């Protein structure tokens, strides 16, 4: 048998915005989660669903940082890609951007099977901020788009079960501290791309697991799935049963439909054009859930599509597959165990009523289940040629625990400057002081790292990180004590003062929080060494929080003073133009505030579901919100 699968490098050039630096301030506040069902609404749900809805929901982004440094100025940029192809399919993978499959082309017909976004435009939809639309994405961690959406993954060539080659992607997911892998290959003579996925729990305790594979397809596609009912989750933020099909192109607001596929039925979902051609996704039974997401036909949904993909590019909808029935649930993964499954993506032409029969002809279920079993031993095969490098966090965890994770090596050579102080803490029991004055690096917060911080010499730098870890653990009083202990001897006060200000706000002490924020910003301005990326990001992040805290307690003149201290380039960013409009309004300068809107601005990091622009506009004007600012995801009456 001649194996014709090829894996090669490619460079894509497309209009792309810069990702920019991460926000250097630790994310201490609770998550603003729109995908949440109230306790009282769970009583009418199936018992297993209600239990998993309440099982270990994510409460903090730590140790991950927020990615909000991107803008909206797009220029032609090169993006590294890996292409896996045979004579039937060509898949284009972006290892530096979450391992996204950006394109899947059926070569005999030339059809693009996915929605291929013509631009790279991050927006605030991932758990930690930056996310982009299009293709097939791998979501792991917790309800929402993964924190790895715009992060690099490790990638390498690996032998495939049929004697050809696989492209392996792997990384360490930091919210739950779990290693995972995605093996992509094209079986000889097949029209399907296979994706073997494995998530491992190396810990001595159970861990909540979340996985959803999301596929963007053109918006005009008709979705077909083997279910009669679905669980609908819309702008009311309630789960309710709905018949299938219960949705059409006139759905006004964004909505999710989680399909209730009967036990024993094959797991699949498909999307077809008007001529009956399209994409089908199927999996082994481990990947239980299927879902459709639409932005809706209302002005807010249309605006979001333009925001993510540009004007005139056509919209998209998503078909998805996950471990649980809904994305609001997390599944228990027992100690020292793993879960794996096999997915397939490929072309299918069929009438809606004959999809399952056509799928069985194209990819028999028994044959596919056997392919999963045949792949499992290959999941442990050590990678060959490395094609891309991810983060060093997995290497640090493997170094700490001496875990053996065959198939997904986390080599010490991947450790970088970010991991260096934590490696030193692991080796010597001491967290080293920074060699130069700069904003603090990220904090590790897992129990084993917190224990090491508690026994390390109590320097101000260590106390800062210990406080962040204690805050994450829910020990807020002890976190405050750690930060306060560090203040008298700390060479850099602003990181500690900012943490204490957040604590004050959480306890309702807003006057004291504003004072601490003002002191923190003054200290940062004195300490700032240059206008480089790190210091600029710190000043912008802390400046924004400080202005907001001062406005909250009506210290308007002080808020204006902070605003005027910000760099001109920072003040021109859309987020700060919105803040300026609010500042002008509370100063009594309504006409000037309205002029900010009339001049136009774009809040690059506008959060999905945020109504901040609309609320401020309502305070300024009686007219309807201009279309360019309308990102509404629910009726204004709610």
Predicted regions and their residues:
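Extended, loop-rich substrate-binding clefts of extracytoplasmic carbohydrate-active enzymes
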Residues: 1, 43-85, 136-190, 220-222, ...
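Acidic-aromatic substrate-binding/catalytic surfaces of carbohydrate-active enzymes
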Residues: 2-54, 81-151
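A contiguous, surface-exposed recognition patch within enzymatic or periplasmic domains that forms
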Residues: 2-45, 82, 191, 205-331, ...
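Acidic, contiguous internal or C-terminal segments within carbohydrate-active enzymes
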Residues: 80, 85, 91-109, 169-221, ...
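Start-of-helix register in tetratricopeptide repeats
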Residues: 461, 495, 534-541, 575
């Amino acid at each position: 048998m001649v194996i014709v699968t090829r894996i090669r490098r490619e460079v894509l050039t497309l209009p792309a915005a810069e990702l920019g630096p991460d926000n250097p301030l630790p994310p201490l506040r609770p998550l603003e989660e729109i995908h949440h069902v109230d306790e009282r609404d769970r009583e009418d749900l199936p018992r297993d669903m209600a239990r998993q809805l309440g099982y270990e929901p994510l409460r903090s982004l730590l140790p991950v940082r927020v990615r909000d440094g991107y803008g909206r100025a797009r220029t032609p940029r090169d993006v590294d890609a890996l292409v896996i192809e045979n004579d039937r399919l060509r898949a284009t993978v972006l290892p530096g951007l979450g391992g996204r499959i950006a394109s899947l082309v059926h070569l005999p017909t030339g059809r693009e099977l996915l929605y291929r976004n013509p631009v790279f435009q991050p927006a605030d939809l991932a758990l930690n901020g930056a996310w982009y639309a299009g293709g097939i994405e791998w979501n792991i961690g917790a309800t929402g788009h993964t924190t790895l959406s715009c992060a690099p993954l490790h990638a390498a060539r690996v032998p495939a079960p049929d004697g050809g080659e696989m492209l392996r992607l792997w990384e360490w997911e930091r919210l739950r501290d779990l290693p995972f892998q995605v093996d992509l290959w094209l079986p000889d003579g097949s029209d399907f791309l296979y994706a073997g996925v494995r998530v491992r729990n190396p810990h001595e305790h159970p861990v909540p697991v979340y996985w959803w594979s999301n596929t963007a397809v053109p918006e005009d596609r008709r979705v077909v799935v083997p279910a009669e009912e679905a669980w609908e989750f819309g702008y009311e933020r309630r789960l309710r049963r709905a018949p299938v099909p219960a949705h059409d192109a006139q759905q006004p607001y964004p909505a999710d439909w989680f399909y209730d596929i009967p036990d024993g039925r094959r797991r699949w979902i498909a999307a077809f054009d008007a001529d009956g051609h399209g994409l089908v996704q199927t999996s082994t039974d481990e990947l239980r859930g299927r879902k459709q997401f639409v932005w809706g036909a209302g002005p807010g949904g249309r605006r979001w599509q333009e925001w993510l993909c540009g004007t005139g590019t056509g919209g998209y909808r998503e078909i998805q597959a996950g471990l649980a029935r809904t994305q609001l649930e997390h599944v228990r993964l027992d100690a020292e165990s793993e879960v794996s499954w096999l997915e397939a993506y490929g072309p299918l032409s069929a009438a809606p009523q004959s999809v399952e029969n056509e799928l069985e002809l194209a990819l028999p279920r028994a044959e596919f289940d056997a392919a999963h079993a045949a792949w499992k031993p290959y999941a442990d095969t050590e990678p060959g040629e490395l094609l891309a490098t991810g983060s060093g966090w997995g290497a640090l965890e493997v170094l700490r625990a001496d875990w053996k994770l065959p198939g997904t090596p986390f080599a010490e050579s991947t450790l970088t400057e970010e991991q260096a102080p934590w490696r030193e803490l692991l080796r010597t029991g001491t967290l080293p002081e920074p060699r130069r004055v700069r904003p603090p690096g990220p904090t590790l917060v897992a129990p084993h790292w917190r224990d090491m911080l508690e026994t390390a010499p109590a320097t101000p730098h260590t106390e800062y990180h210990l406080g962040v870890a204690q805050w994450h653990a829910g020990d807020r009083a002890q976190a405050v004590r750690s930060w306060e202990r560090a203040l008298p001897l700390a060479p850099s006060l602003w990181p500690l003062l900012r943490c204490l200000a957040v604590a004050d706000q959480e306890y309702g002490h807003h006057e004291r929080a504003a004072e601490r924020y003002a002191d923190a910003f003054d200290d940062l301005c004195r300490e700032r060494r240059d206008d480089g990326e790190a210091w600029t990001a710190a000043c912008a992040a802390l400046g924004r929080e400080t202005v907001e805290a001062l406005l909250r307690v009506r210290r308007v003149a002080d808020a204006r003073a902070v605003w005027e201290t910000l760099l001109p380039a920072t003040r021109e960013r859309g987020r700060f133009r919105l803040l300026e409009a609010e500042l002008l309004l509370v100063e009594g300068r309504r006409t000037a505030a309205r002029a900010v809107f009339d001049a136009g601005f774009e809040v690059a990091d506008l959060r999905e579901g945020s109504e901040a622009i609309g609320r401020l506009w309502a305070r300024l004007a009686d007219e309807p919100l201009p279309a360019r600012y309308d990102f509404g995801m629910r009726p204004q009456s709610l």
